A protein has these predicted regions:
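HotDog/MaoC-like acyl-thioester-processing domains
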Residues: 1-11, 87-131
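Catalytic strand-loop segment that frames the active site of acyl-thioester-processing enzymes
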Residues: 1-52
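Hydrophobic residues in beta-strands and at strand termini
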Residues: 17, 83, 128-130
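A broadly tuned preference for mixed-charge, low-complexity surface segments
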Residues: 34-37, 62-67, 113
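Hydrophobic beta-strand-centered segment that forms part of the acyl-chain substrate-binding groove
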Residues: 44-99
Length: 131
C-alpha cells in the first residue's frame, strides 16, 4: 500500500512514448485512425503531427493508480477521466495525483496526465481497494 491518507501524493509515473508507439497501439486496439499513424495526414487535417491514442494515455492513468496497490490491476475498481488535450509521441507524459478520499482499504485518487503544461487528462478519479 502506498498513498492511503487524504491529501497524500501518489508516486505517479513518467513515460516517453517512442515514435512507433501509435503504430503498436493501433495494432493492439484496432484503431487505425490516420491521425495516429500517418504524419502527412495529421498535418493535412491541421494537427502539428500524429497524436497518441487517448485510451493509451488513459491506460497510463490506470497504471499509476494500480501501482499504488502494489501493481495489481485487480485493485482498480473504477476509473473516470476527462480527455482535455492532445498528446504526442516522443514527449514525456507525467501522471500525478493525490488521495481525495480514504476509508480503510478503499482509496479514491484525483489524477492528471500532462505533457509539460498541456493537461491531456484531468479530473480523473480512480477508486482502488487495497483489501
Amino acid at each position: 500500500v502506498s498513498a492511503s491518507s487524504k491529501g497524500e501524493k501518489i508516486a505517479g509515473l513518467k513515460v516517453t512514448p517512442d515514435k512507433f508507439l501509435p503504430h503498436r497501439y493501433a495494432g493492439a486496439s484496432g484503431d487505425f485512425n490516420p491521425i495516429h499513424i500517418d504524419n502527412d495526414f495529421a498535418k493535412m487535417v491541421g494537427l502539428p503531427s500524429t497524436i497518441l491514442h487517448g485510451l493509451y494515455v488513459m491506460g497510463l492513468v490506470a497504471k499509476a493508480a494500480a501501482q499504488e496497490a502494489g501493481g495489481d490491476p485487480r485493485a482498480l475498481k473504477r476509473l473516470s477521466v476527462q480527455f482535455r488535450g492532445m498528446s504526442f509521441p516522443e514527449q514525456e507524459i507525467e501522471v500525478t495525483g493525490e488521495v481525495i478520499e480514504a476509508d480503510g482499504t478503499d482509496v479514491t485518487f484525483d489524477l492528471i496526465a500532462a505533457q509539460g503544461e498541456n493537461l491531456v487528462i484531468r479530473n480523473a478519479t480512480a477508486d482502488v481497494s487495497y483489501g
